Amino acid sequence: MDIKLLYRLAKYLRFYKKDLIIVMISLLSVSASLLLIGSVFRNLIDKGLAEDNILSVNKSILYICLLIVILSVASFFRSYFINNVAEKIVNQIRKEAYSNLINYEIEEYEELKIGDIISRLTNDIDQIATLIVNFLSFFIRNSVMLIGGITLMFFESFKLASIVIVTIPILLVPLIKFGKHVKSLSKKALESKSLLVSDIDETFNNIRVIYAFNHQINKISDFDTKLQSYLIYCKIRLKIRALFFAISIAVIFLTITLIVWIGASDIVQGDLSAGQIISFIYYAIIAGVSSGGIFELLSEIHLPTTALERIITIIDKISIVHNNYYALNNPDTVSIEFKNVDFTYNSRPNLKIINNMSLKINANKFVGIVGRSGAGKSTLIQLLLRFYRQDNGTILINNQDISRINPTDIRKFIAYVPQEASIFSDTIKSNIIFGNNKASDYEINEIIKITGIEEFSNKLHDGINTKIGEKGVRLSGGQKQRIAIARALLRKPKILLLDEAMSALDTMSEQKLLNAIKKIMKGNIIISIAHRISSIESADYILVIDKGKVVTAGSHYDLSKNSEIYRNICREQLTI
């Protein structure tokens, strides 16, 4: 096992010193009770049964009962406190991992699968609990029992104890031989399990599409393929574990048989008493079971340590942070400017999405953005939100370079509504106040009326306090978009970004809602990406983007007269 990993785990353990002291006292009490029983057995046979001394027999039985009580009580405290510590630590680790993950740069999520994240935060962290319990409880207990058992065996018979010691290297050879192989298999098994979780997450997030295309059988087949891959690694690992366990059992019991054989000869010759040989066999069994337990734990330790390693990579991953951020000015008016901005995604380094883009948007403007798919419209918004950093050029808000401003401060000024409305599995109200949890009931009710949520929420049993299911499954696409827009408006942003945010609404509803938005956002900036030209006809001006550049700009009327590319976009919509 990697010592660095143990040291890392020990940093968490230091917060639970009192609990761990109780665990250690309990462990020693359990070990001492079991070891003392062997000594009592010897007295029972040699002084009680051999001498027909019923008083000695009764005393020995009483001592055994007392030791069993101590053993039981100590076992309870050991089990309770170590498992309690393990749960507290894994929850602390889970919180740290979650907190770090949720603060990653957006582009870092492109390298991760949601299923892998879920697997690490659940399965991997549960494995860490197993590591804590096994190491701090069973490993230490078995180590104490092994050392104590061997020591007491030497007190009983040096010759027989020497035979037992010889068997230890025999057990170490296969452990070392199989150890590296098991570690590799454990890593592959965890990765394979992550793929399973990803598949489950993807399947049930897209269950309607699967039903619509009758792909249930195909998905079952795909899942079975991944399941079989996971099972292959598990089977190999279990075979190695079973083989090692079989070797351990064989060596342990052959050793005990040899001890009985030689011990019987010593009894006949008068070198050992019957009580001594029984006591020795008892200690040999204790030592054998303890060593078997240790080897069993060591053969299985690679799975939880690999899981710990995977979690530590999440906790230790540091996103790029600049300490020399400036505060974002908060004047009465707001402005946006792009100066010669270039951008490419890390996943597509050879494809320039934004190409030397320049534009300026002043306060009190409603700006529409159009362009063909892949032109860079949504990327423009994501750069403004600081989801990504531009490769070249400068992006300014209020004449300040946003690369020098904390992204959190930037986003306080902005509200963003994507085409696919992000809805949480909570109530309508909770989803709305996600934009501003300090809003008054009056403000919430006004936004609900303005966005038309009242029209459908009043028909629900609990109104805006109705639970709407995972991802708003109980709502229509248009209803979800209204909630997302209400959330954005409640934020009282200086800049409102709409990325096809009303695509699920009919034209009349869209115009009504848009007029309401324009009133609320008066004096500020609205940027609306649209595939439906009708939604931006009333814009102050429209930016036409092609191949990552603003190729032309103007009102709908001017562009319809003077821009061929704009007319083509309009014609393409009419043919859809």
From Swiss-Prot:
Function per UniProt: Part of an ABC transporter complex. Transmembrane domains (TMD) form a pore in the inner membrane and the ATP-binding domain (NBD) is responsible for energy generation.
Keywords from the named record: ATP-binding, Cell inner membrane, Cell membrane, Membrane, Nucleotide-binding, Translocase, Transmembrane, Transmembrane helix, Transport
Domain notes: The ATP-binding domain (NBD) and the transmembrane domain (TMD) are fused.
Chain ranges of the ABC transporter domain: 336-572
Positions of ATP binding: 371-378
EC number of the protein: 7.-.-.-
Pfam families noted in UniProt: ABC_membrane, ABC_tran
Listed transmembrane segments: 21-41, 61-81, 135-155, 158-178, 242-262, 277-297
PANTHER family listed in its UniProt record: ATP-BINDING CASSETTE SUB-FAMILY B MEMBER 10, MITOCHONDRIAL (PTHR43394:SF1), ATP-DEPENDENT PERMEASE MDL1, MITOCHONDRIAL (PTHR43394)
Gene Ontology molecular function: ABC-type oligopeptide transporter activity; ATP binding; ATP hydrolysis activity
Source organism of this protein record: Rickettsia typhi (strain ATCC VR-144 / Wilmington)
InterPro entries (UniProt xref): AAA+_ATPase (IPR003593), ABC1_TM_dom (IPR011527), ABC1_TM_sf (IPR036640), ABC_transporter-like_ATP-bd (IPR003439), ABC_transporter-like_CS (IPR017871), P-loop_NTPase (IPR027417), Type_1_exporter (IPR039421)
Major subcellular location class: membrane
Membrane-topology descriptor: Multi-pass membrane protein
Domain ABC transmembrane type-1: 20-303
Protein name (Swiss-Prot/TrEMBL): Putative export ATP-binding/permease protein RT0691
Major enzyme class: translocase
UniProt keyword annotation of Translocase present: yes
Cellular-component GO terms for this entry: plasma membrane
Oligomeric and partner information: Homodimer.
CDD domains per record: ABC_6TM_bac_exporter_ABCB8_10_like (cd18575)
Compartmental location: Cell inner membrane
UniProt family annotation: Belongs to the ABC transporter superfamily.
